[in-house]
């Protein structure tokens, strides 16, 4: 599959854009995930500040705190086909904080979070240990495919 079959609507909704991964990076990370698919795929990637992420986490999951990544799968109406998988929302401040806290290079952690969120759109989860182990294995494989070391990357539980 070529990367032009993966269409990303990249929304930069955070105040500080300095140092964010560029569109080409997001495209390569997402394309690595969906390289096995032979059909057109679309998703929205939205980069937000902590205030918006806190609100989204509270509104949709009833958790009164911000988080690093949220995924919102799209389910088309019955009888309608759509290449849209859904939305992945990433919180800039939390991802940058985690990167420093875990001593992981920034680009590597951004890649991990977009991969993690995109896998949720495909139905992967980490609620129970067996699912978490599988999701972590898939994340590690994709991160390696993208050229990142994976010793410090684990799915958030």
UniProtKB/Swiss-Prot annotation:
Its EC number is 3.1.-.-. Its main location: cytoplasm. Its cofactor is Zn(2+). GO terms for biological process: rRNA processing. HAMAP family: Endoribonucl_YbeY. This is Endoribonuclease YbeY. Keywords: Cytoplasm, Endonuclease, Hydrolase, Metal-binding, Nuclease, Ribosome biogenesis, rRNA processing, Zinc. The keyword Lipoprotein does not apply. GO terms for cellular component: cytoplasm.
